[in-house]
UniProtKB/Swiss-Prot annotation:
Zn(2+) binds at H91, D98. N-product is active as a multimer. It comes from Rasbora elegans (Elegant rasbora). PANTHER family: HEDGEHOG, SONIC HEDGEHOG PROTEIN. This is Sonic hedgehog protein. Belongs to the hedgehog family. InterPro entries: Hedgehog, Hedgehog_sig/DD-Pept_Zn-bd_sf, Hedgehog_Signaling, Hedgehog_signalling_dom. One of its GO terms (molecular function) is peptidase activity. One of its GO terms (cellular component) is plasma membrane. GO terms for biological process: animal organ development; cell development; cell fate specification; cell-cell signaling; central nervous system development; neuron differentiation; proteolysis; regulation of gene expression.
Length: 121
């Protein structure tokens, strides 16, 4: 009580590293697949759109901005219906997101992945 926590050192994730260390569609990573959501399904109404061009990632601590001033998070894919993912992809349920940085600097991706894990994704 009353003590300030020291920020822990962020270790970037390695290419193709998962947290937890299991594939996206396994029960341990994301729970049971509930079925594809289409525009005509009842569950489509449960999806929450985000139209804000500046705030596209809930980041109460401004971790992306603090890590790289002037750089924004860039969502390249969220909910999808195009059929370009594997059949039980969480993109079809609105439970997966692909992200990068606005400057598209691949050297930042490991740290960006770690920030996403720390944020609860």
């Amino acid at each position: 009580y009353g003590k300030r926590r020291h920020p822990k050192k962020l270790t970037p994730l390695a290419y193709k590293q998962f947290i937890p260390n299991v594939a996206e569609k396994t029960l341990g990573a994301s729970g049971r697949y509930e079925g594809k959501i289409t525009r005509n399904s009842e569950r489509f109404k449960e999806l929450t759109p985000n139209y804000n061009p500046d705030i596209i990632f809930k980041d109460e601590e401004n971790t992306v901005m603090n890590q790289w001033p002037g750089v924004k998070l860039r969502v390249t894919e969220g909910w999808d219906e195009d059929g370009h993912h594997f059949e039980e992809s969480l993109h079809y349920e609105g439970r997966a997101v692909d992200i990068t940085t606005s400057d598209r600097d691949k050297s930042k991706y490991g740290t960006l992945s770690r920030l996403a894990v720390e944020a609860g994704f």
